[in-house]
Regions:
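Intrinsically disordered or highly flexible coil/loop and linker segments, enriched in small
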Residues: 168, 237, 273-274, 288-289, ...
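Loop-to-transmembrane boundary segments
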Residues: 8-28, 122-155, 186, 217, ...
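N-terminal membrane-anchoring/stem segments of glycan-assembly enzymes
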Residues: 1-131, 481, 507-513, 521-531
Length: 545
C-alpha cells in the first residue's frame, strides 16, 4: 500500500486522526497513574484489590519472560562458536551439503547438538523449497555508518572489526554518512579513515548529507536515507542487483564479531521471504561496560535482555538500533523516514504497512557491541541516560501513524491490525505505568487506609500476599544477575573479582532506575507527544576512558 509515513504537514481528516492518536498513549498513562493515586486515597480497599491483581499479572508475565530469556540466552550461547562462513559456503552446494549433514552423527555437548539440529532443519526446509537463491559469492554487504559529532576513536574500531571478519571484506561496501554540519576535525577524521581502510573493502567512501534540506528533521534517518540513495546510484553503476545486497545501518560505535556478517548472510540465505524481512541481532553494550556506572549497566543490560526475550517470538519483534534488511526492500519502501526521530523502529512499521502486513523481523542469534552511556561525570552520565531513554521512548511517535495506516489499508487482515495495534499501544503504556505501580502506587492504599480498611482481614493479608509475590519474583532477579555476568566481555586483567561482585550488587538499583531512568523518560516522551511538543534528535555523547 502506498502510504505517506509521516505525521507532518497533514490536513483535514488525517490531521485530526493524527492528533487523536498522538494524545491517546500519554492520556492513558496519566489516567492510570493519577486514577490509581486518587482511588488509593478515596477507596483504598478497591485500590488494594486492583494492585494485588496487577501484581499477580506482573508476576506471571515476569516468570514467562524469564523462562524465554533463559531459552534465548541458551540458544545464543549455543551459536557462540559456530563457523557461520562454513555453513554459508555449504548452502552453495545444498544437495551435497544436506547429504553430508544427514550422515553426520550427533556429537558434542547439548549446545552443539541443538545448534546442529536447528541448522540441519533449516537446510532441509531450504532444499525442499527449491526456490532460487543467490550464491554467497554474489552477496554484498552495504554498511551505512552515520556520523555527526563522533570522533575517530568512536567509529574506527567498528570499521576495523568489519575488515577482520570471516565474511570477505571485498564483498562489502562501507559508507560513512557524514553530516555537513560536522566539525572540520571530524571531517578530517573520516577522510583519514577512508584512506586507511578503502583498499580493504570492495569500496569505501564518504557521503556528505547537506544541512537544511526542506522536509527533513535533523535526525539519523535523514542522513542514512541520503547515503542509501547515493548507494543505489553506485550499485546501479556497478551493475550489482539490489536483491543480492544486504543493507545494514549501524550506530557509529557498533563493533561486530568476526562471525557477524557471515551469520547475517546465512540468516538472509535461509530465509524464504528474505526480500520482505529485517534481520535483528542482539545488541550488547560491552565496548565500555567496565567503565560504565551501575545505573547505566543495569539499564543497558535490561535492553539486551528485552531483545533476547523478543527474539523468541518473531511476530512481536521490531527492529531496534543497528539492524539489517534487503536493500531492495529498503528501496521499495523509499528508505528511512527523514522527518522522524525513531528511524530504527519506524523503518519496520513503514515496511509492514507498505507490504500489507507481509513483513517480518528475523531474530539473529548473534550479538553486536556498542557503547554504554558514559560521560565525564556521574551526574552528566545520569542526564545523558535520561535523554537517551526519552529518545528511545519517542518511538511512540510511530503509534499514531501506524493507526492511521491501519484505518486506510484494507489488505491487512483485521485481526492482524487489532493484534499489532494492541501490542504497540500496550507496550508503551506498560513502559510508563508498571514501574510506578510496583514501586510507589502499591504502597498508597496502606498509607491512606481508613479505619474500616485498616481493621479488615484483607488489610492484614496484603503484606503476606505481596511478600509471596515478590519472593517468587526474586527468581527473575537472580536469573538476571547470573545472565548479566555471563554477557560481560572477558576480563582483560584490569578488573578484580570484587568488581564482578559489584556488578551483581548493582541490580539492587533496579527499583530506582526503572522509575527515574525508564518510566519517567517514557512518560516525558508521551506527554510531549500528547501536548504536541515534538522532540528533536539528540546525539548521545560518546566519551572514551
Amino acid at each position: 500500500m502506498e502510504f505517506r509515513f509521516t505525521g507532518n504537514k497533514l490536513t483535514g481528516k488525517d490531521a485530526k486522526l493524527q492528533r487523536l492518536f498522538e494524545i491517546a498513549p500519554g492520556a492513558t498513562s496519566w489516567i492510570i497513574i493519577i486514577g490509581m493515586i486518587v482511588l488509593a486515597f478515596v477507596h483504598p480497599l478497591t485500590a488494594a484489590v486492583i494492585i494485588i491483581a496487577f501484581y499477580l499479572y506482573w508476576l506471571l508475565r515476569l516468570l514467562y519472560m524469564t523462562l524465554f530469556l533463559i531459552l534465548s540466552y541458551f540458544r545464543l550461547s549455543a551459536e557462540e562458536n559456530t563457523n557461520w562462513m562454513e555453513r554459508v559456503r555449504g548452502l552453495d552446494r545444498i544437495e551435497e551439503y544436506l547429504d553430508e549433514l544427514n550422515k553426520t552423527p550427533l556429537e558434542g555437548d547439548l549446545k552443539k547438538r541443538i545448534s546442529f539440529l536447528a541448522h540441519r532443519k533449516e537446510v532441509q526446509k531450504l532444499a525442499l523449497a527449491g526456490a532460487d537463491r543467490p550464491s554467497s559469492n554474489d552477496i554484498y554487504q552495504l554498511v551505512i555508518i552515520p556520523v555527526a559529532k563522533e570522533t575517530k576513536d568512536v567509529f574506527e574500531p567498528g570499521i576495523k572489526s568489519l575488515e577482520e571478519g570471516t565474511f570477505p571484506a571485498k564483498q562489502m561496501v562501507v559508507i560513512l554518512a557524514l553530516e555537513e554540519r560536522a566539525s572540520d576535525q571530524i571531517k578530517q577524521d573520516t577522510e583519514e579513515t577512508v584512506n586507511t581502510y578503502k583498499d580493504k573493502f570492495f569500496d569505501m567512501f564518504i557521503v556528505i548529507h547537506p544541512d537544511g534540506i526542506i522536509g527533513e528533521a535533523k535526525a539519523k534517518g535523514a542522513n542514512a536515507t541520503f547515503a542509501a540513495k547515493k548507494a543505489a546510484e553506485y550499485l546501479k553503476e556497478k551493475k550489482i542487483p539490489f536483491e543480492t545486497v544486504i543493507s545494514s545501518c549501524f550506530d557509529s560505535d557498533t563493533i561486530v564479531t568476526t562471525q557477524y556478517f557471515a551469520s547475517l548472510t546465512y540468516y538472509f540465505l535461509v530465509c524464504p521471504y528474505r526480500q520482505r524481512a529485517s534481520f535483528q541481532p542482539v545488541p550488547v553494550y560491552n565496548n565500555n561496560i567496565w567503565d560504565a556506572p551501575g545505573i547505566t549497566r543495569v539499564l543497558e543490560t535490561g535492553s539486551s535482555f528485552f531483545q533476547l526475550i523478543e527474539s523468541t517470538n518473531p511476530e512481536k519483534l521490531v527492529t531496534f538500533s543497528s539492524h539489517s534488511m534487503s536493500f531492495k526492500a529498503l528501496v521499495d519502501v523509499d528508505y528511512w523516514p527523514v522527518d522522524m526521530i525513531s528511524d530504527d523502529s519506524a523503518i519496520f512499521w513503514k515496511s509492514f504497512i507498505h507490504f500489507d502486513g507481509k513483513y517480518r523481523v528475523v531474530p539473529m542469534y548473534a550479538t553486536l557491541s556498542m557503547d554504554a552511556v558514559v560521560a565525564e561525570t556521574w551526574w552528566q552520565t545520569v542526564k545523558n541516560v535520561y535523554k537517551q531513554k526519552r529518545r528511545w521512548a519517542w518511538g511512540v511517535e510511530n503509534f499514531p501513524i501506524v493507526m492511521r495506516a491501519f484505518l486506510e489499508n484494507r489488505k491487512i487482515p483485521f485481526f492482524l491490525k487489532v493484534k499489532t495495534g494492541y501490542k504497540l499501544f500496550e507496550g508503551h503504556i506498560s513502559w510508563t505505568t508498571w514501574a510506578f505501580m510496583l514501586t510507589i502506587i502499591g504502597w498508597l492504599p496502606a498509607i491512606f487506609a481508613g479505619r474500616d480498611y485498616s481493621q479488615s482481614v484483607f488489610y492484614y493479608s496484603v503484606p503476606r500476599i505481596t511478600g509471596t509475590i515478590f519472593h517468587l519474583a526474586s527468581f527473575s532477579l537472580i536469573t538476571s544477575i547470573v545472565l548479566s555476568l555471563c554477557l560481560l566481555p572477558k576480563n582483560k586483567g584490569r578488573h578484580s573479582i570484587l568488581k564482578r561482585i559489584g556488578f551483581a550488587m548493582q541490580w539492587l538499583l533496579v527499583p530506582l532506575t526503572i522509575v527515574f531512568l525508564s518510566a519517567v523518560p517514557a512518560l516525558d516522551a508521551q506527554t510531549r507527544l500528547m501536548l504536541g511538543k515534538y522532540m528533536t534528535f539528540w546525539v548521545t555523547d560518546k566519551v572514551k576512558k
